[in-house]
Amino acid sequence: MKQYLITGGTGMVGSQLVNEIKKSDSHITILTRHDQISNDKKISYVNWAKSGWEHKVPQNIDVVINLAGATLNKRWTPEYKQTLMLSRIQSTQALYELFKSRNKAPKALFNASATGYYPPDLFMSYTEVYKTLPFDFLSDIVYQWERFAQQFEQLGTRVVIGRFGIILSNEGGALQTMKLPYEYYIGGKLGSGQQWYSWIHINDLIQAILFLINNESASGPFNLTAPIPERQNLFGYTLARAMHKPHETWAPSLAMRLILGQMSTVVLDTQKVLPNKIQALGFQFKYSNLKMALEDLIKE
């Protein structure tokens, strides 16, 4: 039986990942910030906001999956920016300290990250060979998160970094936010509309995470995005058609930056990111183009 330890296991990605892992011969320990009782013999919860939580984590953990982090979908006040950073690096450091104090380290760590690692560019295509240093707040979060995760290599753990694109899911996240203006017939171009949206269907993301965990030759950063990214204007048009709504309005960049503040970088300052590394290992995307993904997620 494979033993998993998961942070962020009750979130959008984590909950679906847990449901998929349960299909195998496994036991899952989920770290949460509140007391929770499990009715499933394959799942147990540990409240790591409480002192002594480390002693409740099983000794024989095989795989750690670290998804914990405060949502980006809130206004980035100075206080919340600190929360965005600390929620990621403190949880990762706590995991590292836990296993550093033990005789047995996990075989593999999967640590979430984001395509915000790469600088915004309208023409560059980014693959995993591209290396950079932080250039803005979001890239600094990603850079520090990955750096803290890489400490696990000192323990002999295989470290896999998953740089998530825009996750398309019916259970929350970006798609629900994107759909909202179209539901009120005010959807359209954002800024120039030429910025890239590197997206991924939630089902492909879950399968990609499991593929990387189970592939012993997988290590380092992986771009977890669909093979065919889209520019925002075409993305919006495709979404509008799937919803049978118009795609006619325009929100200028200046207005969006005034309304959203620094959070506007998530929708305006984006990158064209390609999943070359995971494809080279043989992973096949079920939803490789946006039309196919949205038709699956937006049913009549």
Swiss-Prot record:
Which cysteines are disulphide-bonded? none
Annotated TM spans: none
The record's listing under SUPFAM superfamilies reads: NAD(P)-binding Rossmann-fold domains
InterPro entries according to UniProt: DUF1731 (IPR013549), Epimerase_deHydtase (IPR001509), NAD(P)-bd_dom_sf (IPR036291), SDR39U1 (IPR010099)
What does UniProt give as the signal peptide span? none
Name the protein family: Belongs to the NAD(P)-dependent epimerase/dehydratase family. SDR39U1 subfamily.
Descriptive protein name: Epimerase family protein SAOUHSC_00792
Species = Staphylococcus aureus (strain NCTC 8325 / PS 47)
